[in-house]
């Protein structure tokens, strides 16, 4: 089980938070995503290059994965089914999560799946 901390564009962040988006589409070439991993999603604005400090991170459990061209997904990308976690799990995961990345993310309108999810 790995904890992945990910920048998430505002529209995607809100859709996950509201429960309208129970999946994540991400570039997987630089990460080894797997079922039972946790995603810590931080709302990050690509236009300002800043995190939204008014929003707490979202923690989601990866429950399912599609990562094969057989299903129409490029070999560099992965689609993950995700679900919310309990309050106790949320705290435990955040305590062990890596720090936020201060690296610049992708530019707005460019390579959205790599940075926005």
Predicted regions and their residues:
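Short glycine/proline-enriched turns and hinge-like loops at secondary-structure junctions
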Residues: 19, 53-55, 73-75
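Glycine- and charge-enriched low-complexity intrinsically disordered segments
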Residues: 64-117
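Compositionally biased, charged N-terminal/linker segments
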Residues: 1-29
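Short, charged beta-turn/beta-strand-edge "cap" motif at the junction between a beta-strand
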Residues: 29, 44-49
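Short beta-strand-centered aromatic/proline hotspots
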Residues: 49-66
């Amino acid at each position: 089980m790995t904890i992945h901390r990910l920048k998430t564009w505002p529209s995607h962040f809100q859709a996950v938070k509201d429960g309208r988006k129970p999946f994540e589409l991400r570039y997987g070439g630089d990460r080894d995503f797997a079922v039972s991993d946790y995603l810590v999603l931080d709302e990050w604005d690509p236009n300002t290059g800043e995190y939204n400090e008014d929003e707490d991170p979202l923690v989601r459990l990866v429950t399912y994965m599609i990562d094969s061209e057989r299903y129409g997904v490029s070999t560099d990308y992965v689609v993950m089914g995700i679900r919310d976690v309990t309050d106790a799990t949320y705290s435990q995961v955040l305590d062990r999560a890596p720090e936020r990345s201060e690296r610049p993310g992708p530019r707005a309108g460019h390579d959205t799946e790599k940075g926005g999810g």
